[in-house]
Amino acid sequence: MLIHPRAEPEIAFLLAKDLAGPTSVTGVLAATEAVFGAVDILDSRYQDFRFRLPDVVADNASAGRFFLGPRTCRPGELEDLRLTGCVLRCDGDVIHTAAGAAVMGHPAALVAWLANRLAERGEHLPAGSLVFSGGLTAAVAIRPGHAVTAEFDGLGTVEVFA
């Protein structure tokens, strides 16, 4: 059961091989087997998502659920992930529009950032990891009965019913 869910569109990366830092967007793309359009459902037991770092860790980083789009492609099949457009709709109404560049300039930049932080601890992202880019738009509050749709250029549509 979700408490007060929010939805945000993201781009997900499925790693074909281990990814260790130091790395960059280029390294992430070379290690990626497939990319997906995705919708991340955030939820938190903390009222209005107000919490401190220890709280968010205890709350599993507000992770609720995630949904992957039906179409996958290799990174090179899309001209430039920075230009991958996204339209987020709720019950058919356009709520937000964005492009992949909304996340740190490139959606793979967050994956590189994560691999580099893990490398500082002597760790890495193993092959088979599914890593989300972070929200392309602000998260949108959803209620039971809402239909949330994220349409991605080249990656298809993800539809979620709350």
Regions found by a protein language model. Name each.
Residues A139-T149:
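Short glycine/threonine-rich loop-to-helix capping motif typified by GTGT followed
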Residues P107-A139:
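A conserved acidic, glycine/proline-rich C-terminal tail/linker
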Residues M1-H106, A147, T157-A162:
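Catalytic-core "active-site belt" of small-molecule-metabolizing enzymes
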